[in-house]
Amino acid sequence: MGSIELKKVKKWFNEVNVIKSIDLKIYDGEFLVLVGPSGCGKSTLLRMIGGLEDTSMGDILIDGQVVTNFPPSKRGLSMVFQSYALYPHLTVEENMGFPLKTAGEKKNVIKNRVEKVAKVLKLEKYLNRLPKTLSGGQRQRVAIGRSIVRNPTAFLFDEPLSNLDAALRVDMRLELAKLHQELKATMIYVTHDQVEAMTLADRIVVLDSGSISQIGTPKNLYEMPQNLFVAQFIGSPKMNIIKFRDIYNSSNIDQELRDFLLTKKRVANIGIRPEHIKIVMNSKGHVKATIDVIEYLGADTYVIVNADTLGGVRIRCESNIKFERGLKIGLKFELSKIHFFDQEGINLNL
């Protein structure tokens, strides 16, 4: 078992309330990702679950037992940090087996468990090597292996891939996804990278200033953001947000779009993702625009256009279509994919 529940959890640092009454249930075997911008409280919340930070108010339960005041060693959890924190003078095998050694396990038990975990992480041929001879990705796998050998109730990951270069991060994301499928263990993962969140999570918790902004599957958050904050945070590149008054009063939009914009009341902003806009030639479509910037990314090309007072609108296109800067074009919106947000940022579509 590995279920974790937070009940009305709060955290203060002196007079500053950094975690604001969070209720959250993490299910046994779930891969849950805590995501949000810097300073949103995601790492603090993870450390509170692990017992590395005190909980000011509320309760933390692991498998139904209240552990709010338990020290980290009594919670049965294992943490992997951004820093590998390996002992440089110990071999890979000794590093991985260190938690079991300090717990007083027998040598044969330690050896068997380390070898089993090393096989899962493809570290068998590195067991006799020192950390300094390993790549960054291999060192992180050793750090993960050290947490696995303890057979914890759940794993807590605090931005474990942020020290790796872009290519290694992609590889390690795949390794973590495979590891979760194999272990079927509960994993709570903190990141500021929403791509990591989208590719790894069963569910994502989006945090904003110490509060939960939305919880849901990656698909749910991407397609049905509850508010403007989630709409702009989830997705790469982010959703185009246009002030309602700017687009409605623009002389560059056609009557079909103008009529559609009036189907909702109390609208302050509209949002539409880059893939839900198509470029049409001869300035036809819903909006007249001029190509300002072209970003070629291989399989996709992103075109940023200037459309009167609307600001820069980004469109995703296939790379086999050629465009030139300064070309006058039209934008065709997929009307059913437009999101309407009120003055408080609430999605009026939901």
Predicted stretch roles:
Residues 50:
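Helix-to-loop junction immediately C-terminal to a conserved catalytic motif
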Residues 58-66:
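Conserved ABC transporter NBD signature motif
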Residues 35-37:
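The feature captures the beta-strand-to-loop junction immediately N-terminal to the Walker
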Residues 237, 248-350:
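Non-catalytic connector elements of ABC transporters
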Residues 56-59, 109, 209, 338:
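Conserved coupling/switch loops of ABC nucleotide-binding domains, chiefly the family-specific signature
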Residues 22-33:
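Pre-Walker A (P-loop) beta-loop-beta motif of ABC nucleotide-binding domains
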